[in-house]
Amino acid sequence: SAQFKNSEKEEFFYGEHSYVLQGKFKVDSYSKHAAGRVTFTHVPSDYDEFEAIYQVLGKTPHGTAAMMPMAMEIYGRNREVGEKCIRLLCYPSNVNTVLSLLKDKFGSQEGFTSDDGYHQRYLPAAVLEGATPQNGYNPTEPYTVNMIASVNKHQDMQLYDGRVMYIYIMGKGWDTEQRSIEIVKTSTSELCQIFNCPALLTQCKRIQGTWNGLK
């Protein structure tokens, strides 16, 4: 796994919840050796916390990418709050796709549901460090999202003044552990947004054991 210098580490708090950002993904330049890590003690409790964390993590491509599993988990707990988080985090053209896929994967019931083979309420945990189908997708704590650079270099958007960056989030929930996520940064926004992320929303391997949920 990637090694990070202490100088690359930023920690911040929301109440008693801790968030740590590490890594060197840059909007203005591509590096095939770039790596990132976001570690957090809890999933944000509500929209206010999610928005506050986004104001910090959203300044970097990897911080933004790591917030997608958080938004998915919030949506699983509360559709209304989760949708608000997704609309904040995702680029407008991506919002309806994400919501449609999540409704499909989580089913109609909010909160904690058992696995029926198709509906996978544990999907947000499939990209957290330590979570595997074999251990019921129960990740190590504090929760960690690990990321590496995609083989695809940054691309400038043709229609808008912006740039799309490609990142792999690592997850043991699929045969292909590198889950591609596209991050966009426009010239009119200080924060990045998620441009495309179907690889995080596709069927993962069937769970073995019991998922205990996330804090």
How should each PLM-predicted stretch be described?
Residues S1-K32, G36-V38, V164-Y168, G173-K215:
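Short beta-strand edge/turn micro-motifs at domain boundaries
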Residues A2, V98-K172:
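Surface-exposed, charged secondary-structure patches
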Residues Q3, Q22, E49, Q55, ...:
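Residue-identity detector for glutamine
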